Regions:
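Residues at or immediately flanking beta-strands
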Residues: 20-26, 138-142, 191-193
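Hydrophobic hinge/microswitch elements
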Residues: 31, 35, 40-43, 50, ...
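Short secondary-structure boundary segments
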Residues: 51-52, 74-75, 165-168, 192
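A late-sequence structural motif
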Residues: 8, 166-168, 177-214
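Secondary-structure junction motif
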Residues: 78-80, 86-135, 202-204, 210
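N-terminal winged-helix
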Residues: 1-20, 24-37, 203-204
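Alpha-helical segments flanking ligand/cofactor-binding loops in enzyme cores
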Residues: 36-37, 61, 108, 152-153, ...
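Short beta-strand-centered segments that line the small-molecule binding cleft or hinge
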Residues: 11-15, 33-89, 159, 179-181
Length: 214
C-alpha cells in the first residue's frame, strides 16, 4: 500500500541500496489485493503488508508487530474528561503504550461521536469494527476511506475519530491536533510481514534484503 511505500520502504530500500548499489529495486504501489495477485503471478518478488496471507501459498518473515491506536481530534470536548487515558506521543514512539501503566480507554464513551473508518475489506477497517463490536456499540461512520493516512489526515482536520497503526505514528511528525488512546488488546495487534510466493526461486538478493530489514 502507499502507507508502506511512503513511510517505511523508502528508508529500508535506501539502506539496502547503499550496501548493494548494483542491485536494481523497483517499488510498486498498489492495494493488498492487487499486490497479492502480482506476487502470485511472479511479477513482484516481495510485498510488505499488515494482512495475513494464505500460508499454503506464501512464505513470510515478520517485519514488526503493530498495534492499533484510537486517534481523536483535539477539538472534541470529550478529551477533557479522559486525560488519564491519553497516550503521550513519546510513549507511542517508544511503543510503551501497551504497558499496564497505560489504561485502556472505555471505547463506548465515543459511541455518539463521528468516526472515519477504513472500508471493511481493509484489515484496519475489519479490526476497528470488531473492536467497537466488542465494546457493544456500532460506530457512527461518516466517511469510509481506503487508506490509513487519508483517514488520519481527516482526523487531524477535526472531522472525526480514526484507528491508526503505531508503526506509522512512530514515523510521522507529532500533531497537536490529535489525542491518542490505547485500545482493548483483542483485535488491535497484528503482524506486518514480508511475503513471497512459496516454492518460487528465492534469490540471494531477496535473502539479503530481508536480513537487512528484519
Amino acid at each position: 500500500s502507499n502507507l508502506f511505500s511512503s513511510w517505511i520502504l523508502p528508508s529500508l530500500i535506501s539502506n539496502f541500496a547503499s550496501r548493494y548499489p548494483n542491485i536494481r529495486i523497483n517499488l510498486i504501489e498498489e492495494n493488498t489485493t492487487q499486490l497479492t495477485e502480482l506476487l502470485q503471478k511472479g511479477i513482484v518478488d516481495l510485498i510488505l503488508d499488515n494482512t495475513t496471507l494464505d500460508s499454503a501459498i506464501f512464505d513470510s518473515k515478520l517485519y514488526k508487530e503493530e498495534h492499533l491506536v484510537l486517534a481523536v481530534p483535539h477539538s472534541f470536548s470529550i478529551n477533557s474528561e479522559l486525560t488519564s487515558f491519553q497516550i503521550p506521543n513519546d510513549l507511542i514512539e517508544r511503543k510503551d503504550f501497551q504497558m499496564d501503566s497505560v489504561p485502556v480507554v472505555p471505547l463506548r464513551l465515543f459511541s455518539d461521536l463521528p468516526f472515519i473508518m477504513l472500508r471493511n475489506e481493509n484489515d484496519t477497517g475489519r479490526r476497528a469494527r470488531l473492536i467497537c463490536q466488542d465494546s457493544n456499540f456500532k460506530p457512527n461512520i461518516i466517511l469510509n476511506m481506503d487508506q490509513q493516512m487519508t483517514a488520519y489526515n481527516i482526523c487531524q482536520s477535526g472531522l472525526g475519530i480514526c484507528f491508526i497503526g503505531d508503526i506509522i505514528l512512530s514515523r510521522i511528525p507529532h500533531n497537536k491536533n490529535v489525542v491518542y488512546y490505547r485500545l482493548p488488546t483483542q483485535h488491535n495487534t497484528r503482524r506486518v510481514c514480508f511475503y513471497w510466493k512459496k516454492g518460487r526461486y528465492f534469490s540471494r538478493a531477496m535473502e539479503e534484503f530481508l536480513n537487512e530489514c528484519c
